[in-house]
Each structure stands twice: as structure tokens, then as C-alpha cells.
Amino acid sequence: MAKGKENRIVITLECTEAKKEGKTVSRYTTTKNKKNTTERLILKKYNPNMQRHTLHKEIK
């Protein structure tokens, strides 16, 4: 059996700018290593509803 698989968790990233404007939010799923990155992720990703790159924050 492989060791260390329990450190990687699946997270959801949600658009913050669309939420403020009241538009449809875009969501992305990705994985992160909770041992190396303990704080919440903030990434710039493409929002197809707004047709531009926006900030996406990790949600629970």
C-alpha cells in the first residue's frame, strides 16, 4: 500500500467577484496537500459566466 495518500484532500474553489455582483458563480475542484498548505487557497481562474479571469477562494 502507498503511504501518504491521506495528506491530499479535495477542495472547491468559488468565484468571489461574481458573488459580489450577484451573478452566477463558477466553481472549480482541485486537490491540495493539507500538510504543506494549511491556509485557504486563493487562485486566479477563468469564470466563463463573466468571460474573464477572477479570484477564486477555497470554500468548505
UniProtKB/Swiss-Prot annotation:
One of its GO terms (biological process) is translation. Keywords: Ribonucleoprotein, Ribosomal protein. HAMAP family: Ribosomal_bL33. Belongs to the bacterial ribosomal protein bL33 family. It comes from the Bacteria. GO terms for cellular component: cytoplasm; ribonucleoprotein complex; ribosome. The keyword Ribosomal protein applies. This is Large ribosomal subunit protein bL33. It comes from Pelodictyon phaeoclathratiforme (strain DSM 5477 / BU-1). GO terms for molecular function: structural constituent of ribosome. The keyword Ribonucleoprotein applies. PANTHER family: 50S RIBOSOMAL PROTEIN L33, CHLOROPLASTIC (PTHR43168), LARGE RIBOSOMAL SUBUNIT PROTEIN BL33C (PTHR43168:SF2). Signal peptide: none annotated. InterPro entries: Ribosomal_bL33, Ribosomal_bL33_sf, Ribosomal_zn-bd.
